[in-house]
Regions:
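UBL (ubiquitin/ubiquitin-like) substrate-recognition surfaces
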Residues: 1-284
Length: 284
């Protein structure tokens, strides 16, 4: 990583011209442009792989060309061509919110572009090696290769893994625990590329604490858990945690309510001291 960082020092200070209301796209592209491992991987992909006539790969190629231009020298670029490619891809994927020049949410666009990159790269020749490296890393962290989590991964990622999962994949676990016996009644894993966080505080740390706080499901709260095995309602504790954190942790702050009103509060955080350890199973 240090070698890669050295190659990028004092470069990539390139601005993208706003074409209509594309500022949300430009900010998203700047973020993706600075994920160095990803762009190194994409460049290597196009230098080694036999390319298929696939719309996702064509989109990725257009991004690779724009990224190279952005890092060739520090300048201002008008990304007309790539905006056109985005609009065409949005129509093909029936995602019309990105098919025009209207203002949209940047996090939705980040997810849109990550999904396209994933679809383009899941057929790369080194995918099996990437996935095995991920499994090896899990084992190094003390997660058994025979665990329920690894079985979940192998099922979910069968023919569906890419470098995007290595870099951005967030794996979470939900446990339902009997309040009286502390017995785990059920467990469920899930994964995604970004975590939706409700704006319950002006502090990101507090928002995370509330998001991952235990939830009491009991008679008093009128939300008891129904145990299918014993055919009865029980008082339980619902525990939600990050089972394995990603290299790049994307948080979406849910600013819009059901009445389409935006929460404009400023959220405070220290980029150098955000600690996910209290919310991660493997670090508890």
């Amino acid at each position: 990583m240090n070698d890669i960082m050295g190659e990028y020092t004092n470069k990539g200070l390139t601005g993208l011209t706003n074409l209509g209301n594309t500022c949300y796209i430009n900010s998203s592209l700047q973020i993706m442009s600075h994920v160095y491992e990803l762009n190194e991987y994409i460049t290597h992909f196009f230098s080694k792989e036999h390319q298929k006539n696939d719309t996702n790969i064509i989109f990725l190629k257009e991004w690779n060309d724009l990224h190279k231009l952005m890092w060739s020298k520090n300048c201002i670029i008008s990304p007309n061509r790539f905006i056109g490619v985005i609009q065409k891809m949005a129509k093909q994927k029936q995602n019309d919110i990105f098919a025009g020049f209207h203002q949209n949410d940047s996090t939705e666009f980040v997810y849109f572009i990550i999904s396209i990159f994933h679809d383009a790269l899941k057929g790369a020749s080194d995918v099996d090696t990437l996935f095995q490296c991920q499994l090896n890393d899990f084992e190094h962290q003390g997660i058994s290769s025979k665990s329920d989590f690894v079985r979940y991964l192998k099922t979910y990622h069968k023919n569906n893994y890419s470098i995007m999962d290595t870099l951005f994949g967030i794996y979470c676990k939900m446990d339902i625990v009997d309040s009286s016996s502390s017995k785990v009644l059920s467990s469920k894993y899930e994964n995604f590329y970004m975590l939706d966080i409700a704006l319950t505080s002006t502090s990101l740390d507090e928002c995370l604490k509330i998001h991952f706080a235990n939830e009491l499901m009991n008679k008093e709260n009128d939300n008891q858990y129904y145990d299918d095995k014993e055919k009865c309602y029980k008082d339980v504790i619902k525990k939600y945690s990050i089972y394995y954190p990603p290299r790049y942790f994307i948080v979406q702050l849910k600013r819009w309510n059901h009445n389409l009103r935006k929460n404009q509060r400023i959220i405070h955080y220290d980029i150098n001291s955000i600690d996910l350890n209290p919310f991660c199973v493997i670090f508890k």
